[in-house]
């Protein structure tokens, strides 16, 4: 009887811990200008990396820079006497200190560099993107940022892909 209980308990504990490890994360995204919600992004781990599945609305159509930022805050900060929306999120997640912007699948740049986010003509973003170098575990406590402009995955001709202003943000918890 005790052996059966032990086996049952072990099986349940393993099943629950395995389920907790595989659990997806949902990040609530907020428009930094208005403070209004714009939707969510679901993060899920698979054998290829982390999949970011947006369900976003009320964004400007086109391509947008899309990054993981260093800090888990979407608050504004001040830089050179000017308010920077989402500035408390810091720079792009760069644990190897490369100080270089690049493609999501190369190893010599920020790990927080994601594929650009596509927003349709009606302001919706629903197309998933894959980040092959990331894991869900390392993302907790960081911010997801959507920038006003596109991203050329280079520091030329403009630094950080030329994405510009920060328009929407969410904290990964």
From Swiss-Prot:
Keywords, alphabetical: Antioxidant, Copper, Disulfide bond, Metal-binding, Oxidoreductase, Periplasm, Signal, Zinc
Domain of life: Bacteria
Annotated binding of Zn(2+), by residue: 92, 101, 110, 113
Enzyme class: oxidoreductase
Enzyme Commission identifier(s): 1.15.1.1
Gene Ontology terms: cellular component: periplasmic space
Cofactor note: Binds 1 copper ion per subunit. Binds 1 zinc ion per subunit.
UniProt GO molecular function: copper ion binding; superoxide dismutase activity
Positions annotated to bind Cu cation: 67, 69, 92, 147
Pfam families xrefs: Sod_Cu
Compartments reported by the entry: Periplasm
Main localization category: periplasm
Signal peptide: 1-22
Disulfide bridge partners, by residue number: 74-169
Reaction(s) catalysed by this chain's protein: 2 superoxide + 2 H(+) = H2O2 + O2
InterPro entries: SOD-like_Cu/Zn_dom_sf, SOD_Cu/Zn_/chaperone, SOD_Cu/Zn_BS, SOD_Cu_Zn_dom
Cofactor(s) this protein cannot do without: Cu cation; Zn(2+)
Similarity comment: family membership: Belongs to the Cu-Zn superoxide dismutase family.
Subunit details: Homodimer.
UniProt-recorded name of the protein: Superoxide dismutase [Cu-Zn]
Species in which this protein is naturally found: Photobacterium leiognathi
Lineage, uppermost ranks: Bacteria, Pseudomonadati, Pseudomonadota, Gammaproteobacteria, Vibrionales
